[in-house]
Amino acid sequence: MFKAELNDPNILRTSFDAISSIVDEVQIQLSAEGLRLDALDRSHITYVHLELKAELFDEYVCDEPERINVDTEELMKVLKRAKANDRVILSTDEGNLIIQFEGEAVRTFKIRLIDIEYETPSPPEIEYENEFEVPFQLLKDSIADIDIFSDKITFRVDEDRFIASAEGEFGDAQIEYLHGERIDKPARSIYSLDKIKEMLKADKFSETAIINLGDDMPLKLTLKMASKEGELSFLLAPRIEAEE
């Protein structure tokens, strides 16, 4: 038996708003410890990891481990129907993921589980020399600023500043943030702006983004709940461009 109840529908909605933009299907692993998933997009550019601990939920029961395959677009269609004050109840039964919203009325949705063989990807083991924090909204605003001129973004970090910049045909943009962290080795890398915009759809998950950056290395972006009961993280491959 699996059943999970949550008073805040935004946690699931904001998580899967980002996830559904990256991957079409996911395998959700259910256990006594909580809910987690690991997925890689078809182009092998973006890796996503979600972990919601059992303690996050107002009620949580999982008698035995279970793996369910879900179409993320169909799941997101349902989660978008949640109202701000709804209580969300998740359960599984006879090949369905059942989602109930309890508010002014009780609304029940059944999403058919996908019967496919799914190989859960393992996260690549990457060692970073740099880690720093940036306010999530500042990062999101920076992406919107860069989007005016370019479809790619350069991230740089040195001992004082985190810099997001772009050079476009019709103009340039640069945003600087004093991170206040200890950075031993400056780093620079270029990424797809659209891919980062997909990740930042999870704008209600955390107020802070943790960034790991290296020269021409994948970007690691981690969002952690203040309660430490949930984590959403991404790895994004860099754009390697030939020097002119």
Swiss-Prot record:
UniProtKB keywords: DNA replication, DNA-binding
GO biological process: leading strand elongation; regulation of DNA replication
Pfam families registered for this protein in UniProt: PCNA_N
Gene3D superfamilies hit by this protein: 3.70.10.10
PROSITE patterns, per database record: PCNA_1 (PS01251)
Role, per record: Sliding clamp subunit that acts as a moving platform for DNA processing. Responsible for tethering the catalytic subunit of DNA polymerase to DNA during high-speed replication. In conjunction with replication factor C (RFC) stimulates DNA synthesis by PolB, relieving inhibition by replication protein A (RPA).
Protein name in the entry: DNA polymerase sliding clamp
Organism: Methanothermobacter thermautotrophicus (strain ATCC 29096 / DSM 1053 / JCM 10044 / NBRC 100330 / Delta H)
Lineage, highest ranks first: Archaea, Methanobacteriati, Methanobacteriota, Methanomada group, Methanobacteria
Gene expressing this chain: pcn
